[in-house]
Structures are given as C-alpha cells and as structure tokens.
C-alpha cells in the first residue's frame, strides 16, 4: 500500500549511490512550475513540506520527459527509451550512468504500461497499415514445400513422362509449308509500303488506298489460314503461325490507319504551315515490323545502348522457364486431360473435380507463358532494338474488375484497341457500350482464329469465352463503384483460374479427340 500511496523512483547517481525521488511530488511541482513558466522542481509547498527536497538535475530532466509523455499519451514504453537519453537534447552526454538511470526509471512498476488506445495489428482498422512481408515469406515457403511434395509424388507415381522428342521431332520437318508461310508474310508490309508510296506521289486517290489496304490485310489473314488447314501440321506449329499472322495483321492496320491520319493532318496543315509534310520511310516501317509494339509511329523513344550481359541473363531465364512450362504440361496437364471426360457430358461432380484438378497446373503454365513472353522475350527484343518504351504490362494481378484486367495485362494490344478501334468508334458517335462490345468482338475473333484453325475445330469456345467477358466487365465495374470492394478481383481470379481456361482446355481437347476418332 505504501508503494501505491507514494510512487517513487530509485535513481543511480554518478558516484554509485542511490536516491529515492517521490514521483507524485515531482509531478505536482511540474504542474505548478509550468503554470508560472518555470521548470523548478524545488521550492515551498504548504501542502507538502517535504517538497523542499529537490531531485538531481539529470533525474529532473528524465522526469520531465516521462511526465510530458504521460500527459500526451503517445509514448511507446519499449521504443521511447531505446538509446538512453536521446529524447532530451544532449541526452547522450550523460554517459553510461544516465542510461542506467533511464532504464531503471522506465521499467519501475509504478510507471504506466498502457498510455493510449491502440488496435491489434490484425484488426480490421489496422490490418492494412501493417507490413505483411513475413506472412508473404511464409506463403512462399509453404508454396514451395507443397509443390515440391506434389512434384516428388508425381514422379514416384507416374515416372518421367517427358519424351525425347519434346523439343524437336521428325514430324516438325513436315511443317515446312508453315515455315515458308511465315517467311512469306514479309510480302504484305512491302505491299502496304508500295501503296503509301503511290499515294504520296499522287498516283492513286484516297478511296483506292483504302481499298488496297483492305485487300492486303484480308489476304494476309486468309493465306496462312488456308496453309494451316491444308497441311497436316503439329498444333504448336499452327499456333505459332497464326499468332504471327495476327501480329502482322494488327501492325498492317496500324500502319495504314496512322499513315492516313498523318496524311490528313499534313494536307490540312498545308494552308497554315507549309513546312508540315507527310513522308514514307521504308526504314521506319521495317523497324516497326520487328519492334515489340503494335502501334505505328514514324519514330520511337530509344535506349542508349545494348546491355549484352543483361540480354544473356534474360535469355537464360527464358530457357529455364520454357522448360519448366513444358515439364508441367507433360507431367500434369496431359495426363489429367487424357484421363478426363467431356465436361459437358456425364457426371457434373466429376466434371467439376477435373476442372479443379486442372486449374492449378493450368495457372502455372499461363503465368510462365506470360512471364516468358511479355517480360522476358519482349524485353530481350526491346533491348536488342534499343526500344525505349517497355511498358508491356501493368500490375494486372491487382485488377479490381475484369475491365481493369483487360486494360492492364497486355499493353501492346490494349494500346492498339484504344487507338484503332475504341476511340475511332467514339469519334463516329458510336455509344461507349457498343464501342466496348466491338473491341471485345475483334479480340474474340482473333482468339478463335489462333486456337480453332490449328485444331481444325470450329466450336467457338474461345470466341464465346471472350464475349462472356463483356457482361463480367459491367458487373464488376458496378460492384467496384457501388461497394468499393475487391470482389471484382476475386471474380477475375475465379474466372481466370478455376472456370475459364481449364474449361476451354477440356472442351477443345475432347472435341479434338472426338474429331480424330471420327476421322479414323
């Protein structure tokens, strides 16, 4: 009871002795001295005669600091006293004895341990203010451990399933027509350049230019489709040709559209500024056709030099992740797909189980594909060509809606869509909603071409899958605007990982197997 009635502090003096300082009396003196603009801890007090006994100067300094912290309620017991007398000016000059006195005073039972209201780190008000680096490291460790166990279990159960002809087989030699078709695609940019050269020299009119560009772009698509359908080529070879075909088509459209716009601006500026002119450069077109962009412009931001060591490291990563992607396909995806049934036929629970089992390896393959192409390959190409603008993607994994995902994950295509589809539709007085639908329609057509033509199977699964994104865009945008929550991100990941891609893989595989079975 004596301690409760009269809280005190035992301090260590410089000569090694000890003194007892009454904390309550010091606080009363502090309040009286503050009212008279003084910091006196000694004087006369009619109510407490013993207050005439003053405290040592160094103790008074530390008492002032603690009393102020106690009054403000903002001090952290553990953190405020690390480092001795740093809280007071020149506190370190007191030597080791002063630091011992601080520690002795701070951890006295009479000193308050709770000075302000605080939330738990995982409470709803404080959870997003904390650093979760440790939990992230834990998730990485658990992910590595779980997947390592699954890989070992798979190898023990099924053995090594990757065949020796995984990278190259004799069948690849039969795909030489597709290889020749890839090389011959360079004819179409030359044809587009010739058209622009003719219109520059006033040999043809604008309607003829538009008609010729339409013929060139249509032929550029139909010719590879015909070659792929006629040749009994491997699926990977067909997909490669169709992807290259789509890239060249998008570049040709951008070249024609941008050249038309520059030509229009130059013609309009002739009256006001004769120095503004339109020119055609084969060098700029050739650079554009190999540059990692789909939007044509006469010049691009360039980097200063080529970092050869950096390119070598990125190329090594490309080989490693491509091999890892092939390992997952051969060891996991192919066995799961072969041992499954058509998802639209048979037991519903069985179909759900197969889709869920396929979702994880399919996600890993997709992430590896994204990393290999959009980060490694496009950056390697940009480095070799000194291409400066390397925003090939944004943080699409944080997308709050499906619309945000489509705007962030593939920046070259997004910029092309905005530049040559979306805003031209708006300038033509087309409603915004219809312009979005048109953009998704173009994307759906090319997704279907890249998958259906190599499979020689036109079931429109890829087309419908892309068009199904349109209502999801409006739904997730509404949820984001109405509630401001991350439910849109959850819906995106569910469609992306669980429902969408695994379902399309199963649908195309079984339809392809059924077609081959009926042909044999």
UniProtKB/Swiss-Prot annotation:
InterPro entries: Diacylglycerol_acylTrfase1, MBOAT_fam, Oat_ACAT_DAG_ARE. Keywords: Acyltransferase, Chloroplast, Endoplasmic reticulum, Glycerol metabolism, Lipid biosynthesis, Lipid metabolism, Membrane, Plastid, Transferase, Transmembrane, Transmembrane helix. GO terms for cellular component: chloroplast envelope; chloroplast membrane; endoplasmic reticulum membrane; lipid droplet; membrane. Residues 34-54 have a biased composition (Low complexity). Its EC number is 2.3.1.20. Disruption phenotype: Decreased oil content and modified size and shape of oil bodies. Ubiquitous. Highest expression in young developing seeds. It is a multi-pass membrane protein. GO terms for biological process: carbohydrate metabolic process; embryo development ending in seed dormancy; glycerol metabolic process; positive regulation of seed germination; regulation of embryonic development; regulation of seed germination; response to abscisic acid; response to cold. The chain crosses the membrane at residues 126-146, 176-196, 207-227, 233-253, 276-296, 317-337, 365-385, 434-454, 457-477, 487-507. A motif (FYXDWWN motif) lies at residues 392-398. The active site is at residue 447. Signal peptide: none annotated. GO terms for molecular function: diacylglycerol O-acyltransferase activity. It catalyses: an acyl-CoA + a 1,2-diacyl-sn-glycerol = a triacyl-sn-glycerol + CoA; 1,2-di-(9Z-octadecenoyl)-sn-glycerol + (9Z)-octadecenoyl-CoA = 1,2,3-tri-(9Z-octadecenoyl)-glycerol + CoA. It is found in: Plastid, Chloroplast membrane; Endoplasmic reticulum membrane. Optimum pH is between 6.75-7.25. The keyword Transmembrane applies. Induction: Up-regulated by glucose. Induced by abscisic acid (ABA), jasmonate, salicylate, salt and osmotic stress. Belongs to the membrane-bound acyltransferase family. Sterol o-acyltransferase subfamily. Interacts with LPCAT2 and LPAT2. The AS11 mutant has a complete duplication of exon 2. This is Diacylglycerol O-acyltransferase 1. It comes from Arabidopsis thaliana. The lineage of its organism: Eukaryota, Viridiplantae, Streptophyta, Embryophyta, Tracheophyta.
